């Protein structure tokens, strides 16, 4: 068994993270668990691994959208698919999310940005998604973007990405209980079991 929060590692350009982002608050309430939201720059890790994104593999991309379409109704979600992909400015969204985690509104921004990406067709990290998502949650886009684009915030994102790499993380979303990683939205329940029982139960 493990005590304390579950670390929720995600990158804003990840399509499958949409499913986790939009249900995590309900999961936290239902199970009495705290999640620590940890944005990181997955693309840096994938580049080191010479991993080819789904966008360059049509069959995998078709499956991805179908898989999300099948799973979304379980969580009461109605995305308009396919959403714009790949998200070419996801690093901007990651920086804004990281800034928000330090000020207490990060999770709200992430939910708003994913909602606009998957329900309104506004690519995450790009405009109008970023500024509109910030306004949706009562934040000033000019102030936040200045903070997000600062050298200090860029250094923090690199440090968080390094921390993810040290944990062996190679995908988003990943849930970490102690130092035990669970990759994928469909492994969230396994992570909850591991935290409660120290093993996976049926």
What are these regions (language model features)?
Residues 12, 18-117, 194:
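Structural alpha/beta surface segment adjacent to cysteine/selenocysteine redox centers
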Residues 3-7, 11-33, 115-202:
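C-terminal cap of thioredoxin/glutaredoxin-like
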């Amino acid at each position: 068994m493990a005590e304390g929060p579950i670390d929720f590692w995600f990158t804003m350009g990840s399509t499958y993270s949409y499913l986790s982002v939009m249900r995590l608050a309900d999961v936290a309430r239902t199970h009495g668990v705290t999640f620590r939201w940890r944005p990181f720059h997955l693309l840096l890790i994938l580049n080191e691994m010479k991993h080819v994104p789904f966008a360059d593999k049509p069959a995998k991309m078709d499956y991805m959208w179908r898989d999300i379409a099948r799973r979304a109704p379980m969580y009461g979600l109605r995305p308009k698919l396919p959403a714009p992909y790949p998200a070419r400015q996801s690093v901007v969204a990651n920086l804004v999310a990281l800034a928000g985690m330090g000020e207490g509104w990060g999770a709200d921004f992430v939910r708003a940005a994913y909602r606009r990406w998957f329900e309104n067709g506004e690519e995450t990290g790009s405009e109008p998604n970023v500024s509109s998502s910030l306004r949706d949650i009562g934040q000033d886009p000019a102030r936040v973007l200045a903070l997000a684009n600062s050298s200090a915030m860029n250094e923090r994102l690199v440090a968080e990405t390094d921390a993810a790499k040290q944990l062996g993380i190679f995908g988003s979303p990943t849930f970490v209980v102690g130092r035990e990683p669970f990759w994928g939205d469909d492994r969230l329940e396994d992570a909850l079991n591991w935290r409660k029982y120290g093993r996976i139960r049926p």
